[in-house]
Structure formats: C-alpha cells, structure tokens
Amino acid sequence: MNELTRTFFNSSVHDTDPLIAQALDDERARQKNQIELIASENIVSQAVLDALGHEMTNKTLEGYPGNRFHGGGQFVDVVEQAAIDRAKQLFNCGYANVQPHSGTQANLAVFFLLVKPGDRILSLDLAAGGHLSHGMKGNLSGRWFEAHNYNVDPQNEVINYDEMERIAEEVKPKLLITGGSAYPRELDFARMAQIAKKVGAFFMVDMAHIAGLVAGGAHPSPFPHADIVTCTTTKTLRGPRGGLILTNNEEWYKKLQTAVFPGVQGSLHSNVLAAKAICLGEALRPEFRDYVAQVVKNAKVLAETLTSRGIRIVSGGTDTHIVLLDLSSKGLNGKQAEDALARANITSNKNPIPNDSPRPAEWVGMRLGVSAATTRGMKEDEFRKLGNVVADLLEAESAGNGPEAAEKAKVTVRELTEAFPVYAH
C-alpha cells in the first residue's frame, strides 16, 4: 500500500479537513448542550448512527432484492428485505417500498403512480398544517397538478370534515391527501376515506410526522382506510432521513416499484436502508410504545403549561407531539420568538398558523415538538419546567428584556441537558 492509499483509508476527517471537522464537532456540542424542540427532529440511536457510517455506503445498486442491476448486492438484499418485512409488520400492511430518499420523494412516487399532470388534488392548506409537497405552488406538485385545499374550522382550528366533503364534491379531485407538518390534532381517517370514496378519489395519507405515534399505538392507524400511505423514517420514528410507501393493494404495489425506480429515483442509499431496518426494528420493541405514549403526555403537559401562562395554543391543545403557539397576543412574530429561545439554547422554529400572513417574516406562529427531548428521557416534570422557561423567555422578549431572561434560562437548560445526556462519545 503506497502512502496516498494509506492516507486515504486511515486518516480521519480531523486529519484531512479541519474546516469540516470543526463544524462536525460544533454540531455535536450543539446537540449535547441544547434542547431540541423542533417538531420534525429527533435523536437516532447509536445503532442507527453505526449503520449510516458503515462501508455499505460504498455499494451502488438499482432494482430490488433478488432483481438488481449490479452485482455484489447480496448483503444489501438482506437489510432491504428486513426493512420491508419490519415495515409491513409495524404498520400492519401488505406491501412496503423502503427505498424513497425522503418523504417528499415518496409523495412524488405516489403522484407518479396515481395522477397525471393537470389532474386535481385536494389537500390541507399549508397555513392550517399541510405540507409543501401536497400542491404548494413553489413545489413540483403545485406545478404539475391543479391543487385545491380544505382547511380547519375558524372557531376550533380543527379540520372541518363537513366542509372538506363539500369542497371534494365541488372539486372532484383525483387524489385526496391528508397529513402535513403542523397539524396537532388526531386525524379521522375513516371519515376522509368515506369522502374520497363518495367523490371517486384515491385516498393518500402522508403520516410523516405521526408515523411513530401510529407505530406505537398513540394515534389511530390509516389502515385499512387509506389506499396508500407515505411517511418518513425520521421525526417520531427516530430513524435516518428517508421515506417509506405502504399499501395493501397488490396491483398498485407492483406499479409502485417502477414508480420509485426508475420513476423518480436512481440508485438506492444502501447504508440508509440498513439504518431504516434498524429503526423499524427498534419501533417493534415494547419500549417504543412506552416512548410514544410519553411523547403525547409530554406534549399535553407542555401545551397546558403554556396555556396557564397566557399563551394561546392553536386548536386549544394537542393529540400528537406538536404544540403550535399563537404569539400575536404577546406582540411577537415567530422569528422573534425563535431567536428568544435560541439565546437560551432551545431550538424551535417559526411557523404559520391558520389564517396567518403568506409572508414568512410576518408569521405569528411557533411550532414546538417534544420528540427529541422525550428521547433524552424527559417526562412531565421536565416539560412543565420547560414550558415555564419558554413562557418566561417569550414574556421577556415582549417586554424588551430578552437577553437578560436568556442568561437565567440557560442555567435551567444546562441542568436538563446534563441530567439527560445523549451519546457517550
């Protein structure tokens, strides 16, 4: 082995790329020392990290187990088949495609399968908690299809199923979509399936945010009501970045294989498939049900604590991991609130709420999520404490005393992160 080869195979990132090494070290420290309250984030297990950094990342493959376009894929076949089998068992469905690189890629594959350019789709309005890949104009789905929206009731901010039915009868969509990125309430899949059937639409559920809750029995399953289901393996599933597509329709499944490859993707990410299989296996264990039950308890406590401090919670509470705040009564916008929490080492994100401004700079909403902090082991007492810290920070920001309050809050955050640490390294 010559020196160049020896260096290539044996040098760490700290040896070869100080800039990136420093960024990686800084990110590790950030995750260790900050409390993550972004609803779309979680913390993966060490086993998932092991898979993501494995040599399997070197293997290029196209096709499916037993039917590949490249040789040497026998061990990737093992992990992909395990991921398929575990997904089917976890979500009690007949067929699973585990190759999508993301939830949006999974959605695109379903569109490729079920609808044609110009067809009508009906989905939850983005400001009401929907997702950009469900027909937003800035997304390909909004350019390819004639997108229409249903909304939440202006009084209780919960999906108005009667109004959804009225719109569906008027629009006659080819595809009815539910799910999104900021809807905190339980979804009535049975009612929506009835609406879809009544108007002759396919019914698709994007459960990216609630997949872990469904898997652990903390939210009703979209099966047997949905025709097809997509999700991510991140968020409440605590896995790597990637997507899944699930169905009970054998004919669709066969067509779905080609919709994913070569329809919207090329080669698969072999190491990510291994990580997906691991996280799905973790979700099949009894302790995962305990985890998601705690997630919902923690979210409810956080919402109740913030409400008791005079902060309005959209829809009056939550049934999931998401708590959506209306900051207008505090005279703040979402970015100001996000910055106020960030100064105290709490990460969050601004978010639109129902009937919010279309301009992100003017959004008055903030989305909080409890999944990552629950993974660290925090329970109700910690979330009462966190809720009061968040309320203190928002009140101080509104009064012009944000930086001073942040210094005090940092002490509590440090106590919590030290009491509930992450990885040993």
From Swiss-Prot:
Q: Does the keyword Transferase apply?
A: yes
Look up the signal peptide feature and give its range: none
Activity control mechanisms: Inhibited by hydroxylamine and sodium borohydride.
Disulfide bond residue pairs: none
Q: Where are the transmembrane segments?
A: none
Lineage top rank: taxon: Bacteria
UniProt keyword annotations, A-Z: Cytoplasm, One-carbon metabolism, Pyridoxal phosphate, Transferase
**Which GO terms of type biological process are on file?**
glycine biosynthetic process from serine; tetrahydrofolate interconversion
For this protein, the Enzyme Commission number is 2.1.2.7
Cofactor(s) named in the record: pyridoxal 5'-phosphate
- Which top class of enzyme applies to this chain? transferase
SUPFAM superfamilies for the chain: PLP-dependent transferases
One Pfam family per UniProt: SHMT
State any single GO MF term. D-alanine 2-hydroxymethyltransferase activity
Q: Which GO terms describe its cellular component?
A: cytosol
Residues with N6-(pyridoxal phosphate)lysine modification: K235
Quote the CDD domains the UniProt record gives. SHMT (cd00378)
Could you say which residues are annotated as the site Plays an important role in substrate specificity? T234
Q: What does this protein do?
A: Catalyzes the reversible interconversion of alpha-methyl-L-serine to D-alanine with tetrahydrofolate (THF) serving as the one-carbon carrier. Cannot use alpha-methyl-D-serine, L-serine, D-serine or L-alanine.
- The identity of this protein, by name, is 2-methylserine hydroxymethyltransferase
* Organism of provenance: Paracoccus sp
